[in-house]
């Protein structure tokens, strides 16, 4: 049994347990299928409900918004009091904030004299109006160095904590802190929020994340864990709008606000949204142009929702495997807006065609007539957790490839810092084919003259490969222990099933390359080849 117990601080193991059962449930307070959503939450065993409340543009009734937020939290905690609900404070403010009164407690928290006034939109904007930071006259990125912005963020954090929320997503933190040199004001604000949570939160703690690979100030991290969207590489030689995931950056390590230290903090990854589509008319562009326009002309969740049900299931499985190999936590898509990527589908209550503007993971039924029916896929993925632990992963700190100033003990030969595995498989892991200098397929030194790299190959087939030392083609290794020069000398390996984990192992002094494979058919036990 996993441990989900915490109070005031959270241990690393418990934090990871929560993130391993995380779901993105965007604006769940507005769902039209709450009863079935609660059933699905319980059925799946979700422990972290991301983005369950919040808004980008202010709701018409502020008190109603927080009333609905509190009501949702109460109903969720009735089915499982251990669940963490997350609310959002995004990188956006609009003029309607001018009608929201500032409570006296907010002024008092900042040591100010209470005033009978509302928030001021004008006082939150960046004064110099950098390009793209002002959105016409009525919208803008807030500037955290402005006191009014910090009053706004603190107010919203306090209201969500009072409503039963124990996590906050702080959006694109590096944008609204652009003028906050050294993150001084942001750090002060976050400490104020934590102080409030220690007194008033359900379990005396609020977890804060943002879209960031990490903010470390003299070794101390601002965020409790990190969050980021996935990054893709389009695959154009397969039928359909196919893509693979690629590693982008890493998660910063240091001293966590909860008192523990790690070389790399846990990070949560999601299918993000930003309007549904980035190309209105797909017929107006070439296939190549659309492939490289975000996710085939969609945002991330829009692309995912517009795949077939079978393709969705396979991509969920692929994402889970990719995340395990790269030490990420997959925040499954439970509910997410589709906007312009809305999907025509048959209703589960009357059999009529309709258009779904939200992705819902629920089984399609009269109780959730526009569900995408992926509950069982997620259950199989999460039930396979023990088997997934057998996978040999890449190092937790993915930015450290090792082999710096390492020498073979017997001969004194210096080992190369840069070793790359390349070949025809590379486009299916997000690299250029036959690129012997690729950072994407650079191998990690793990000691004992050995370099490794684990990847997930989504398509069955035969692939060629070779290992290049120093990223050059002067001495490459593959099927035997003898070096070759040039790009044409390679070995071959066969992937029998889609979504197979492949691990390349290169022993520098022995000049051997070994390939191990794990296939996870989630209905069966894993196979080792």
Model-derived regions, located:
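Acidic/polar N-terminal loop/beta-strand segments that form early-domain functional surfaces
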Residues: 51-54, 88-90, 424, 456, ...
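Extracellular Ig-like/FN3 beta-sandwich strand-entry sites
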Residues: 460-462, 499
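Aromatic-rich carbohydrate-binding modules that target alpha-glucans
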Residues: 412-460, 470-493
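Compositionally biased low-complexity segments at domain edges in trafficked proteins
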Residues: 496-528
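Glycan-processing catalytic domains of CAZymes
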Residues: 1-408
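Surface-exposed flexible segments
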Residues: 344, 349-352, 359, 469-487, ...
């Amino acid at each position: 049994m996993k441990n989900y117990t915490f109070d005031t601080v959270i241990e690393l193991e418990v934090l990871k347990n929560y993130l391993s059962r995380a779901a993105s449930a965007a604006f769940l307070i507005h769902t039209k299928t709450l009863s079935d959503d609660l059933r699905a939450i319980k059925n799946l065993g979700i422990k972290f409900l991301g983005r369950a409340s919040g808004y980008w543009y202010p709701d018409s009734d502020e008190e109603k918004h927080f009333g609905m937020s509190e009501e949702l939290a109460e109903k969720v905690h009735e089915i499982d009091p251990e669940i963490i609900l997350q609310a959002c404070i995004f990188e956006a403010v609009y003029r309607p904030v001018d009608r929201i009164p500032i409570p006296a407690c907010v002024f008092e928290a900042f040591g100010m004299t209470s005033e009978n006034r509302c928030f001021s939109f004008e006082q939150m904007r960046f004064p110099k109006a950098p390009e793209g930071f002002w959105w016409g006259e009525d919208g803008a990125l807030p500037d955290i160095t402005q006191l009014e912005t910090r009053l706004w963020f603190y107010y919203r954090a306090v209201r969500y904590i009072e409503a039963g929320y124990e996590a906050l997503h702080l959006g694109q933190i590096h944008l609204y802190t652009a003028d906050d040199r050294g993150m001084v004001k942001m750090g002060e604000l976050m400490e104020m929020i934590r102080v409030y949570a220690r007194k008033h939160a359900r379990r005396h703690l609020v977890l804060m994340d943002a879209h960031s690979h990490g903010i470390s100030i003299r070794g101390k991290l601002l965020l409790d864990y990190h969050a980021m969207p996935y990054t893709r590489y389009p695959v154009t030689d397969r039928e359909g709008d196919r893509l693979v995931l690629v590693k982008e950056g890493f998660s910063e390590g240091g001293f966590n606000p909860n008192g523990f230290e790690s070389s790399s903090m846990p990070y949560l990854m999601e299918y993000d949204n930003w309007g549904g589509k980035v190309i209105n008319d797909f017929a107006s562009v070439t296939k190549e142009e659309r492939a490289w326009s975000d996710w085939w002309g969609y945002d991330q969740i829009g692309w995912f929702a517009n795949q077939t049900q079978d393709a969705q299931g396979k991509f969920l499985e692929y994402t889970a495997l990719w995340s395990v190999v790269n030490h990420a936590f997959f925040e499954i898509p439970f509910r997410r807006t589709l906007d312009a990527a809305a999907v025509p589908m048959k209703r589960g209550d009357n059999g009529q065609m309709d258009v779904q503007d939200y992705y819902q993971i629920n089984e399609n039924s009269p109780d959730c007539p526009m569900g995408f029916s992926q509950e069982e896929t997620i259950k199989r993925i999460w039930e396979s957790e023990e088997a997934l632990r057998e996978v040999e992963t890449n190092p937790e700190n993915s930015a450290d490839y090792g082999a710096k100033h390492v020498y073979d003990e017997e001969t004194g030969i210096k080992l190369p810092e840069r070793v790359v595995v390349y070949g025809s498989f590379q486009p299916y892991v997000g690299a250029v084919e036959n690129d012997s200098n690729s950072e994407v397929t650079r191998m990690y030194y793990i000691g004992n003259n050995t370099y490794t790299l684990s990847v997930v190959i989504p398509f069955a087939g035969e692939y060629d490969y070779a290992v290049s030392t120093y990223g050059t083609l002067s001495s490459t290794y593959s099927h035997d222990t003898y070096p070759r020069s040039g790009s044409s000398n390679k070995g071959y390996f066969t992937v029998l099933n889609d979504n197979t984990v492949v691990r390349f192992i290169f022993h520098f002094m022995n000049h051997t390359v070994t390939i191990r494979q794990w296939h996870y058919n989630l209905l069966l036990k894993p196979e080792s080849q």
